Amino acid sequence: KFDGRAYEGLIEGKAALGWAGGAVLAGNLELKHMNSTRLLAALGSDLLTEGELSARLKLDAKADRLDSLVEALRVGGGFEIKRGAARGFDLIEAARSSGRAVARGGETKFEQLTGVIQYGQQESRLGDLRLTSGLLTAGGNLGIARDGKLSGAMNVELKSSAAVVRMPLAIGGTAKAPQ
C-alpha cells in the first residue's frame, strides 16, 4: 500500500507482486487532482491536455521474468479531467466546417472530460469519452497506436438560441498533430 503527492495532486494505491508461473503484478491506483499536462509529459505521452485529472485505475501484468513486467503492463479504468483544454484540435471549428476540410490546430476548452482508458503496449484506447463545455457536448472514442497515430470518432453537438448542430467527426493524424 502506498500514498503520496505527485504532479500537484495525490496518488494512492495498493499493489501485489507475486511469482505464480512467472512474475505477476496486480493493483489499484487512484489519482486525485493531478496536473494532467505534467503527468502525461512524465509518462512520455504526446497528447496535449491541460486540466485537473482524477482517475481510478486497475493495473496488471504477467511476464516470464521480473524485468519484463513493465513491457506487459496493462492499465484500465475511469478518468475525469476538469477545467481543461485539449490542444491541437478545435472541435467547435471542426463541427462548423461540416467536414468540408480537415481541421488542424487550435484547442478545445472544456469544463469536464470523462472516459475510460485501456492502456496496453501496442495501443491505448479512450472510450466512452464525454466532453462538456457550455453549449458544446461531444462523445466518442479514440485509439492511440504505439507510434502516436490516432483513430477514432466524436459526435459533436453545438447548441445556440436558434439551432442545434450535430456533426459526426472522424479523428486521425497523430497525438502531436491531430486532425
At which residue positions do the language-model features occur?
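Small-residue helix/turn framework positions
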Residues: 1-178
